[in-house]
Amino acid sequence: MPAATVSFDHTHVISPDPKGTADWYVDRLGGKVERSVTIAGAPQIYVSFGDGAMVIVRGERPGEKAAGKTDLQWGIDHFGMRVTGDFDALCTELRTKDVKFLMEPTVINPTTRICFIEAPDGVSVELLERKD
């Protein structure tokens, strides 16, 4: 048995418009801005979700230059957020807010449905519904 327990804490997103990006997670996915600070010369906004997960959004720091998204890269492809409640109603609401669906809701096994949406700055977010 390990001496420590590891659990997921946050996803960190770098954006040219940190406030707009944080607002997107609040308006589209129901997050809540917990705090907004400046660290190393760049805004950093903490957006929490009901299960304790956090998306931290920050801007470019002085002297940094973001390359932007290019072709497929090794590393993180997307992050997933579990939906509890009415998955279809959430998808309908996201469409009314002009959220781009990268993959429509799809049944991937008898207990799981997923879809992919595009967040600001080309970030891919998987929404999943699991029926236990």
Task: List where the protein language model places each region.
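Conserved beta-strand-loop-alpha-helix junction that forms the acyl-donor binding cleft
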Residues: S15-P18, G41
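Acidic/polar helix N-cap motif
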Residues: D17, G85-D86
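Conserved active-site tyrosine of GNAT-family acetyltransferases
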Residues: T21, Y25-V26, L94, G122
